[in-house]
Amino acid sequence: MTAHRDAIRTARSMVVKVGTNALTTPAGVFDAGRLAGLADAIEARMKAGTDVVIVSSGAIAAGIEPLGLSRRPRDLATKQAAASVGQVALVNSWSAAFARYGRTVGQVLLSAHDISMRAQHTNAQRTLDRLRALHAVAIVNENDTVATNEIRFGDNDRLSALVAHLVGAEALVLLSDIDGLYDSDPRKTKGAKFIPEVTGAEDLAGVVAGPGSDLGTGGMTSKMSSALLAADAGVPVLLAAAADAASALTDASVGTVFAARPVRMSARRFWVRYAAEAAGALTLDEGAVRAVVHQRRSLLPAGITAVSGRFYAGDVVELRGPDAVPVARGVVAYDTTELATMMGRSTSELPGELRRPAVHADDLVAV
């Protein structure tokens, strides 16, 4: 067993993400029995001493049958209606499954906006931490009834990566109908090569990922992107089939493992890099790009050539090179109107109260 798999096997805390396809029959019907089986595997891991938070998809799928729908809805309003009905069935199923072991579950509904706003981000963290302290099993799902774009992409893959860092988890396990990463879709390509471990970009050379299924929205592209996000933040990831949940959660002997970076990213830098929504963008000249990206220095107004969006001091902004390609993200020290009058000017030309960096090096994260 590699050190990367061993890190997941010995993790004292983890997030387990359960995809929609892991909770439905081949015909697309929500299956509480499948959910109970996954709860058994998760319970075994918790009984061994690991603290587990569950990110569960499946609300929309669970709402299809009660509403008399013939298939997963495609329009947003019906998706949200199905989610509102299905979320009840989903949480009740998790509650019943863990009640067999004397455990209580708590429901936490989040949206991308909740994670992106610093105050809500902190509140979500406190809630999850308190649930764990009270020995309740947190069941996290995207708040589909109010989500817009987020409801259509990701199937909670990205949310699970964000939650893993949010709660300080030592591992993330993604369970779906896919048994790992291949260089192409094994269901369509004969001889598709299985990739057991991803330690760097070279392991992904030539990988062709596909879109999501009809029932879920998170295809291999979403899973791979989310796994890389978590790994870059310092959380090792295991991508495995729900059918192999027992092995995945016991000894991490199945699936594809994504190695984590050696040093875990701080909570603030992670929020700036991945969680926060950029309120605007600053275009930099070549000298400023070198200073920010390669020398890890603060961004001064002199290196800014353009300002876009409407933002305020304390917001996160995207930093772009002359070619408009994003090079970093950071917390800006001025609002849009102030910075528009300061850009391109040296610090010595500015009044004393405007001589702070536009973005301090401590608040910068290269992308």
UniProtKB/Swiss-Prot annotation:
What is a single cellular component term in the Gene Ontology annotation?
Answer: cytosol
Q: Alphabetically list the UniProt keywords.
A: Amino-acid biosynthesis, ATP-binding, Cytoplasm, Kinase, Nucleotide-binding, Proline biosynthesis, Transferase
Q: What residues does the PUA domain cover?
A: 279-357
Mind telling me which PROSITE patterns this protein's record contains? GLUTAMATE_5_KINASE, PUA
The record's EC number reads 2.7.2.11
The GO molecular function terms of this record are: ATP binding; glutamate 5-kinase activity; RNA binding
Sites where the protein binds substrate = 57, 144, 156
Q: Which residues form a coiled coil?
A: none
InterPro entries named among the record's database cross-references: AceGlu_kinase-like_sf, Asp/Glu/Uridylate_kinase, G5K_ProB, Glu/AcGlu_kinase, Glu_5kinase, Glu_5kinase/COase_Synthase, Glutamate_5-kinase_CS, PUA
Q: Which GO terms describe its biological process?
A: L-proline biosynthetic process
The catalytic activity, as recorded, is: L-glutamate + ATP = L-glutamyl 5-phosphate + ADP
| Residues engaged in binding ATP | 17, 176-177, 217-223
Task: Report the locations given in the UniProt record.
Answer: Cytoplasm
What pathway is it annotated to?
Amino-acid biosynthesis; L-proline biosynthesis; L-glutamate 5-semialdehyde from L-glutamate: step 1/2
Where is it mostly found? cytoplasm
Instruction: Tell me the disulfide pairings in this chain.
Output: none
**Family assignment from sequence similarity:** Belongs to the glutamate 5-kinase family.
The record describes the protein's role as:
Catalyzes the transfer of a phosphate group to glutamate to form L-glutamate 5-phosphate.
Protein name as catalogued: Glutamate 5-kinase
Q: Which organism is it from?
A: Mycolicibacterium paratuberculosis (strain ATCC BAA-968 / K-10) (Mycobacterium paratuberculosis)
